[in-house]
Amino acid sequence: MIVRTEDQKLVDVDDVDCSFFLVTVDLWSADGKQEMNLVLHPSSTDKYAPPNPPTKPSASTTRRRTISSSSRPPGHQASNSSTPAPPRPDEQPPSSNGSGYYPSQSQDNLTPSSPYPPHSNSEQPQTWGYPPPPPIDRAAPFPPPVLPSIQSFNRTASGDWNPSNNDDNYPIDPALRNPEGYTNNAQPDQPTYGSGTTYPPNYQTPPMPPNSGNATPQNNIPRNLATYTRTLVGPLSANACRLLDEHRKPGIFFLFQDLSVRTEGTFRLRMRLMNVGAPPAPEPGSCRVHNDISPILAQTFTEPFIVYSAKRFPGVPDTTALSIAFGNQGQKLPLRNRHGTGSKRRRRNQSGSEGESEDDS
């Protein structure tokens, strides 16, 4: 660093308080017109990976989903046995031949002694000994599902029916309560059979969308974002040091011991000088660092230099006399030993002396 007065006269180094001077560096292009501190690199992190990868469904799950999603009219129920109560609609196991659903009969035709209707497939043998079912008109509309009576929830201890119109206690879907084409002439009670078991109404289970649990919303898929990497690596700032140059003249120097560039090409370093001391800095007498913004006192660019890859690197250049002078003053610099270290020369001398002594003997 060279300090001049307003009259362009050099200021003596001993008259400058260099305790709070600081220089920062950044990387620029060879012409000094474009900043090169960041470089764009492709990265594997740009590829989107779903947080929960879809798992392959098992064979039983696929078979059950295929059977349950097959075309069946609403209101049908499976008949796997003759007397036990049927399970819930969402837990009904599929039959072995996949045709275990039958249309619901009207209440007039159902009597306690009437058996369950067998399978609708007429080609299969009569396993249970029941007569063949009557022909079914599949073009006819199916009756709407019959809901349980609301009065059954407010029955008193004496057995009387106590109607209630309070919809808040027992919320029911309005679409199920009054479906289209459904009248209020339906009988409130369900048919009972000889065993005394009351069967719940038939509800149509909504079809499950395929891979609904593994579907990933489109809004959560991030776009391919650019990944930037810092090109100039190392200590990007240095404090001022009062040292002697190779001619034994004092001066103020800023040393950057280990700077490296990750990209090939020709670059320059931009250096900016600032003072981080509290007033009266930069005049002598400052005792602490300020917490405000530091103005740029000076700025300059280095000479262009070439960065090589590991394969094209021509080799480490010779150490300059100025670097040797700084190293002799205790500065830690990556210096290259041109003639080898003293220990290697010592080993070489010792091996040579031992060889001469053996020849003399």
Swiss-Prot record:
Q: Where is this region: Disordered?
A: 42-222, 327-361
Q: Which InterPro entries match?
A: Velvet (IPR021740), Velvet_dom (IPR037525), Velvet_dom_sf (IPR038491)
Please report which protein family the annotation says this sequence is part of: Belongs to the velvet family. VelB subfamily.
Instruction: Name the gene for this chain.
Output: velB
This protein is called: Velvet complex subunit B
| Induction note | Expression is down-regulated during fruiting body formation.
Some GO term, biological process aspect, for this entry: which one? Answer: sporulation resulting in formation of a cellular spore
Q: List the biased-composition ranges (Low complexity).
A: 57-74, 93-107
From the UniProt annotation, give the residues forming the signal peptide: none
Q: Subunit comment for this entry?
A: Component of the heterotrimeric velvet complex composed of laeA, veA and velB; VeA acting as a bridging protein between laeA and velB. Forms a heterodimeric complex with vosA; the formation of the velB-vosA complex is light-dependent.
State where the protein is found.
Answer: Nucleus; Cytoplasm
